Amino acid sequence: PFAGFSHQTRQRDEEMLAYYTEDRIFETWERAERAGINTMITNNETPSVVQAVKEYLRTGGSLQWIAQIACRKKSNMFEAIDEAVNIGCCALYFHGGYVDERYRNKDEETIRAWCDHARSAGVAVGVAAHAPEAHLWVHSLDIADFHAVCFFNCGSLHNGKGHKFKLRDMGRAIECIRQIRKPCIAYKIMGAGRIDPGMAFEHAFGHIKPADVVNVGMYRGDKDDMVEENVAMVRDILSGS
């Protein structure tokens, strides 16, 4: 939501962008800290978001930053990796659209070079992808430290193939996560706002591996206390309440 990617409508995108000023982004991170969240994930390309991350980390923010890396605004992926590392990411993963393309072309050399470059900088490196097959291919190469697995094979907005949400995809994503013998970040577990949050959290934590986590976007324009409410739901689920 910080970058205006609602995965719903263009009007919704614009609403999110207008709402999330730098002050509101900072407030959301501060509320996440107080609620017990320890990590945030953002992209590396939206100027307002990148600037907010820089300022937050510069002023001692306690959340760890995992960067989703793309290179549409850089000359190559190595330059994008270096910038995120210099800003202060603790880990990074490559945008699913880039990994999907490497999988289609079975381009092991390129994705291995990206992973090696990031790891040489001292950060954990992972991959996202929109189809389980791409994740299983990368996993077979044993080159990533973790996987960011989308619950829906919805495609990438950046190539005009996004917004495809089918419930049948969820089972395949979960099966993929359970086959991958490395930590996974499950994302789009609510289908970009299409699934009730409580049901989505319960379903996700009931099926992912014990060391896995979830990544959810939070648009406080819909509900100001969304951060605290989400944390409370997850605590209840994990405690068996």
Q: What residues fall within each predicted segment?
A:
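Surface-exposed cleft-lining segments at the edges of enzyme active sites
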Residues: 93-107, 120-124, 157-162
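Glycine-enriched alpha-helix->loop->beta-strand junction motifs that scaffold or abut catalytic
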Residues: 36, 58-62, 86-91, 119-121, ...
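Structured C-terminal cap/extension of enzyme domains
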Residues: 4, 12-16, 22-30, 55-59, ...
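Active-site-adjacent beta->alpha loops and helix N-cap segments on the catalytic face
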Residues: 44-60, 73-79, 98-114, 132-137, ...
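Glycine-rich phosphate-binding active-site loops on the catalytic face of alpha/beta enzymes
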Residues: 96-98, 146-156, 207-223
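Hydrophobic faces of well-ordered beta-strands that scaffold small-molecule active sites
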Residues: 1, 39-42, 63-69, 92-94, ...
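Histidine/lysine/aspartate-rich catalytic loop segments that bind and position anionic ligands
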Residues: 136-165
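Active-site beta->alpha loop and helix N-cap motifs at the rims of alpha/beta catalytic domains
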Residues: 10-105
